[in-house]
Amino acid sequence: MNSKVFAVLLLLALLTCVLSEKYCPTPRNTSCKKMNIRNNCCRDSDCTSNAFCCAEPCGNFCHKASDKPGGRRVDPNASCQTGYVYW
């Protein structure tokens, strides 16, 4: 009996973790002129209020987490500098 209760509790814990996953929102812009690329962040710790640093066509920006996948979080190990990006 105890093993069944444990299994149910474990399953509920796993389900809670999966359902509480947060993502970067889908970017509004799908393209960007190279002269307008600006990084406001390079990692999540650059953002306030537990926002995510999300990669977009015009640079990296902080966004509130979304329940729906569609955006892409910035790789914290990638080479990045905040400010305007010049090619």
UniProtKB/Swiss-Prot annotation:
Residues in the signal sequence: 1-20
InterPro entries xref list: Elafin-like_sf
One GO CC term, this protein: extracellular region
Subcellular location: Secreted
Cysteines paired by S-S bonds: C24-C54, C32-C58, C41-C53, C42-C80, C47-C62
GO-annotated biological processes: defense response to bacterium
Record's comment on post-translational modification: Contains 5 disulfide bonds.
Record's protein name: U14-lycotoxin-Ls1a
Organism: Lycosa singoriensis (Wolf spider)
Organismal lineage: Eukaryota, Metazoa, Ecdysozoa, Arthropoda, Chelicerata
